[in-house]
Each structure stands twice: as C-alpha cells, then as structure tokens.
Amino acid sequence: MPIRIPDALPAVNFLRNENVFVMTDSRAAVQEIRPLKVLLLNLMPKKIETENQFLRLLSNSPLQIDIQLLRIDRRESKNTPMEHLNNFYCHFEDIQQENFDGLVVTGAPLGQVDFGDVAYWSQIVQVIEWARAHVTSTLFVCWAAQAALNILYGLPKMTRAQKLSGVYEHQTLNPLALLTRGFDEGFLAPHSRYADFPPQAIREHTDLQIFAESAQAGAYLFASVDKRTVFVTGHPEYDAHTLGAEYWRDLHAGLTPALPFNYFPQDNSDGTPLATWRSHGHLLFSNWLNYCVYQITPYDLRQMNPTLE
C-alpha cells in the first residue's frame, strides 16, 4: 500500500520515477480505509532531499499512510524555497491538539553544538514532551536520538573526538525482536555523526532495550519496552551518494575529512559507491510501522491512550 502525500509535493514524481507506490490526496479521498497518520519533523537543511529519503522508506509498507510534514525552525532557510515550506509544512501550533499514529524526527547537523545553544531547542523539547500524550510511537533518527535521550532520560550529550562517517557492520542481539524481524544477523548501515552512543551507557542509565549494535559505531537500534519510543543512531534513509556528497562538501570547504569507512569501492573516492544498506533500511521502517504503530494504535485516534495498556 502507498503513502499518501499532497498532489503537488515534488516527492510525488521523484518517487514514482523509482516505481514507488504513491497515492495523492485526491485519489486517497475515495478510499474507505483509515490511513495511519504519520508526522515527519524534518530538521535537515535540505528538506526536499530529506523528504524524498524518508518518504521512500515509509512507502514500503502494506499500509496507507497519511504524511504531515512539520517544521519548528521559523528562520529563513538557505537550502529550501520558502514557497515549498509554506505549501507543504505545518507549524507545531497547527497540529498540537491532534493525535498521530507515528512521528519521525530526522537528524540535524548539530553534532558539535551544545543542546542549549540549538536555536530551536525549546521547540524540540516541546514536541518530544507533546508526543508522549499525542503519538503512539516516535522514531528518533541520529541527532534526534541523542536529543531525545537527553530530554526523556537525562543522558548528557556524548561526543566523539572524530566524526563517525561510513558504512558499518552491525549485529542483531535478539532473534525474536519484532523491530529486527527479517534482519540478517549481520547487516550494514551508514553513519554520519559526532554523537556517541555507548551501549553500556544506554543499558546503565535507561530501561531501553538494544536490538542492534556495532563494535565500531556503538548502539544502533534500541527502544522502550512499550515500543512508544524507538531510536536509530545511523542514517538508513541515506541515498547511495549522500556520504560522498558530505565528504566532498567538507573537502571543498577546506576541511580534512576522513574518507568514509567501507564506502567508496577500494577506498577510491573516484569510484561509485553502492547502497549496501537499502534493504535493511526498508525493513526497519516497515517493522516500525507494523509492530510499533499499526498493531498498537487505536482505530479512533480521539481515544489515544498514552500508556498503551
């Protein structure tokens, strides 16, 4: 089944060109089925690119999904046309009285910025606190995972001395876990972050269950027992070229970035990298939508039960 997005959103044609099943609002309106309401809080500067990446993963499900795009930073964007933001994004006050089946919070290029110095930190706190009563399950990605650990569990910001960039091997830890159902015991996932997620710190200071981790990248996938908060520390949504684009961007800016690990063929930056993580990225989002959202959320969202008992 498809995701449901506005007819004029650029992602419609982008995803259809990839043979992704997309349903526009006009077509979905005649279907007598309740779609899942999923809110996407997009914190990345290049919002259209990020929309495409996440909508691709959210579309690979037998469920119809009604996507609402959310922004909380009212500053003028240098990377996304204001017309696009005005046409397709809502502000928090527009939806704060509503309930949603799912919320995805993207990463943000804020790895070396203290939480208190983030321009929209108070809004991040507000959304995450709001989600506890208004969203069945929230998926935090990369920087958002670090922010949520601080807000919900009081974990201090942990930062690596060197940026973690590359495609790393991970291992699943529980063969019966629903979030990793269908995963290979070892799988690849890309990372691009300064944030550090030591498994020991998560086990000692939270009640979260870790389902996949990496000897090099640390904890990758973990969640609360009730499945209402799910954390992914990498970037399963990345395109094949994204890590390379970040590398060349930093290089051209006069920085000395390390070559992304296990990314370019034979570590030759002139080579064309392959998206070796794509299948597990799709499976992760499909499992989250099915087991953490669809199987738990009430049919009538007006009857939202924050404890999911």
Curated annotation (Swiss-Prot):
It is an enzyme of class 2 (transferase). The keyword Protein transport does not apply. Substrate binds at residues 163, 192, 249. One of its GO terms (biological process) is L-methionine biosynthetic process from homoserine via O-succinyl-L-homoserine and cystathionine. CDD domains: GATase1_HTS. It is found in: Cytoplasm. Pathway: Amino-acid biosynthesis; L-methionine biosynthesis via de novo pathway; O-succinyl-L-homoserine from L-homoserine: step 1/1. Keywords: Acyltransferase, Amino-acid biosynthesis, Cytoplasm, Methionine biosynthesis, Transferase. The record marks 192 as: Important for substrate specificity. It holds the Pfam family HTS. It comes from the Bacteria. InterPro entries: Class_I_gatase-like, HST_MetA, MetA_family. Its main location: cytoplasm. GO terms for molecular function: homoserine O-acetyltransferase activity; homoserine O-succinyltransferase activity. Its EC number is 2.3.1.46. Transfers a succinyl group from succinyl-CoA to L-homoserine, forming succinyl-L-homoserine. This is Homoserine O-succinyltransferase. It comes from Edwardsiella ictaluri (strain 93-146). The lineage of its organism: Bacteria, Pseudomonadati, Pseudomonadota, Gammaproteobacteria, Enterobacterales.
